[in-house]
């Protein structure tokens, strides 16, 4: 929006023409918005008794969290949208693709959270309907980018740590994009089980995507680093920084002991947005490395279900795996910080892959 005012109202703020400055302003704006509205949101939702529903078969240590308000993802989404609309060039179609996922998946998460609170159970929206709506939005997103944008119509798959790192997969790319969107959103959702556990890996992952979006817009740098050239992808860096700032602002209140949880409205929206950005940048497989914590959590749930159905035995004492460590007696803050450390290491490994061959 500021770009529009600067151009057509002749304000002549040259600083707005530089991506790094707009990215920094975007981060700071979303961060301070969350710092400002966070306490009001927490107070209001406590007053309305919009508390996190604790499942009966969960860790006993979680019973102390039952009076913690949830749906903090609402102010995460708000601050991201505000900063994005304020600082991004809104004529860039990539921005609207990600915003559509942010809002669409956030709405599904909101309905899920609302049903949990209203009926006071941890089930929320039925699983089949949840995946149905997530899938519908995912396929609409994929169709839109295929129809409207030739720059990302390529169906080449970029494989990290590979000398010949681009492979044509044709129509399989549609299914890959679908699994990236739906899978990432649910992976973040599964990871969001401890105070601050999910948001910091989200921040790390987003920082990685920020760098790639900057590299991808330069044909020489993208060729040198073996990343897909995506024209005008630098605007995504500003959106990414809005996510980082919002995440840091949310972590201010979500760090142990948490004063608010993001709920499904936040986890589905953030996960879906990261998946969408990775698809636009053709970094679907690198996303798996960057978001290895989310992958690990998801695999732990899948293995637990398969093992119990086939062997009638559990691999983990409780899934997702962060609950397994809780049941073993490891303190929650210790689990959280160790997961953060692993997430940071995975980010660094993923960045090394850009020029390893």
Swiss-Prot record:
Function: Catalyzes the initial step of the lipid cycle reactions in the biosynthesis of the cell wall peptidoglycan: transfers peptidoglycan precursor phospho-MurNAc-pentapeptide from UDP-MurNAc-pentapeptide onto the lipid carrier undecaprenyl phosphate, yielding undecaprenyl-pyrophosphoryl-MurNAc-pentapeptide, known as lipid I.
GO biological process terms on file: cell division; cell wall organization; peptidoglycan biosynthetic process; regulation of cell shape
Cellular location(s): Cell inner membrane
The enzyme's E.C. designation: 2.7.8.13
PANTHER family: PHOSPHO-N-ACETYLMURAMOYL-PENTAPEPTIDE-TRANSFERASE, PHOSPHO-N-ACETYLMURAMOYL-PENTAPEPTIDE-TRANSFERASE HOMOLOG
Pathway membership: Cell wall biogenesis; peptidoglycan biosynthesis
GO CC, one annotated term: plasma membrane
Entry similarity comment: Belongs to the glycosyltransferase 4 family. MraY subfamily.
Gene: mraY
Family annotation (CDD domains): GT_MraY
InterPro entries membership: Glycosyl_transferase_4, PNAcMuramoyl-5peptid_Trfase, PNAcMuramoyl-5peptid_Trfase_CS
Enzyme class at the top of the EC tree: transferase
Keywords of this entry: Cell cycle, Cell division, Cell inner membrane, Cell membrane, Cell shape, Cell wall biogenesis/degradation, Magnesium, Membrane, Metal-binding, Peptidoglycan synthesis, Transferase, Transmembrane, Transmembrane helix
Membrane topology per record: Multi-pass membrane protein
Statement: the UniProt record of this protein carries the keyword Cell inner membrane: yes
Entry keyword annotation includes Cell wall biogenesis/degradation: yes
Cofactor list: Mg(2+)
Reaction(s) catalysed by this chain's protein: UDP-N-acetyl-alpha-D-muramoyl-L-alanyl-gamma-D-glutamyl-meso-2,6-diaminopimeloyl-D-alanyl-D-alanine + di-trans,octa-cis-undecaprenyl phosphate = di-trans,octa-cis-undecaprenyl diphospho-N-acetyl-alpha-D-muramoyl-L-alanyl-D-glutamyl-meso-2,6-diaminopimeloyl-D-alanyl-D-alanine + UMP
GO terms for MF: metal ion binding; phospho-N-acetylmuramoyl-pentapeptide-transferase activity; UDP-N-acetylmuramoyl-L-alanyl-D-glutamyl-meso-2,6-diaminopimelyl-D-alanyl-D-alanine:undecaprenyl-phosphate transferase activity
Parts of the chain that traverse the membrane: 23-43, 70-90, 91-111, 127-147, 171-191, 196-216, 236-256, 260-280, 286-306, 334-354
Highest taxon listed in the record's lineage: Bacteria
Protein name (Swiss-Prot/TrEMBL): Phospho-N-acetylmuramoyl-pentapeptide-transferase
